[in-house]
Amino acid sequence: MVNALEKIEDGKLAIASSDGQEKRQFLTMRIDSQAFGLPVIKVQDVLRPQNITKIPLSKPEILGLINLRGRIVTVIDVKKRLGLPLDTKPLDKKSKNRMVVVEHKGELYSLVIDEIGDVLDLPLSKFEKNPENLSPIWKDVSQGVFKLKSLLLLILDVENLLKI
């Protein structure tokens, strides 16, 4: 089970805590009503919604491009990508929506999510494969889960999410 996490960490070693358990840090977020975790090492930045330049004839889940400190970033609407109901409110700086910038294969992508959470230190011993009864929508973009006290935290598989 640890191997799946090592894969998404690009071979980085986990940190041993004072109780001897290996732990990794995950940025938590919400997409629709589901809680997700993203390895902190994958996160480049977290932004409030920015001005987006539309790309003519692009796929519906690609909202456009933003300029982040001189680098061009492709903006992905995660809800559209997963076929989930879309928000009726526009994406603006006052909304709770955030843009989580990740790097994948040398390119930057901004994932538009509903809400950002905390950074959690989670023991690798608690990581499990996806449950068999997990919705196919979530299973396709999740590498596995952490069962926390009040929720199931899916670990986002950025590579599968960005297969557009």
Predicted segments — roles?
Residues 1-164:
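An acidic, low-aromatic, low-complexity terminal/linker signal
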